[in-house]
């Protein structure tokens, strides 16, 4: 059977150890901080990036250059291996589209997948992909199985500070200033891969109660298989959420990491991303 190689970007929130252990090739996004450029997870960590956000510095994220994908695909596919390239939602970044364009410019056999998610929402798809490759499942069947898995994943983001939303033009400066004064915490979810703001919470506790209600509705009669929490330097918030979810859903295993800069650049310090995978 033809060898299958997995490629992704730097936004899955999976550990470096896991990615390396499973021979997953990462093409990182780029970050710009006060005009200086950095390679995500190479020149700067997620924790370091959040420190810059806390200082209210000008930060931006950008997709990898198309040449990065072309070089990777040509090198990885030169022995005839199939390449499965899975990336953060096309509704959040141009990374998927750039990867697809690159796949059409090389001789290698490349299948590019839009995860329609980010953080552990992408990470759980990668983990499932790893298992399917180990089982020898064909690439066409893998695409179908990931489409089905995606229906069992729900992602929410609780905005920490509104400054980044103001800078990104998602809300007006006036609304942002009022929201900051009232300590409003907008909550967003991904709708077909695009971030939609769906609720405004006033406190951490009220945001957690809202998430509990929404997740209960999402899982219905199913059990929770995995919970991933990516946070922007607010581990005490994560601990509160875990306590509520332990009691409500009997979850005792969590994947926790500092959130990808692609999220924290828009959500600010104090944000969390919650990803639930139901059985």
Curated annotation (Swiss-Prot):
Query: Which terms does the record give in the GO molecular function aspect?
Result: lipid binding
User: What PANTHER family does the record tag this protein with?
Assistant: DEGV DOMAIN-CONTAINING PROTEIN DR_1986-RELATED, DEGV DOMAIN-CONTAINING PROTEIN SPR1019
Q: Tell me the keywords, alphabetical order.
A: Lipid-binding
Domain of life the protein comes from: Bacteria
According to the entry, every stretch annotated as the DegV domain falls at 4-278
> Which named protein is this?
DegV domain-containing protein SAR1438
- In this chain, hexadecanoate is annotated as bound at 61, 93
- Presence of the UniProt keyword DNA damage in the record: no
Task: Name the species this protein comes from.
Answer: Staphylococcus aureus (strain MRSA252)
Q: Cite the InterPro entries for this sequence.
A: DegV, DegV_C, DegV_domain_contain
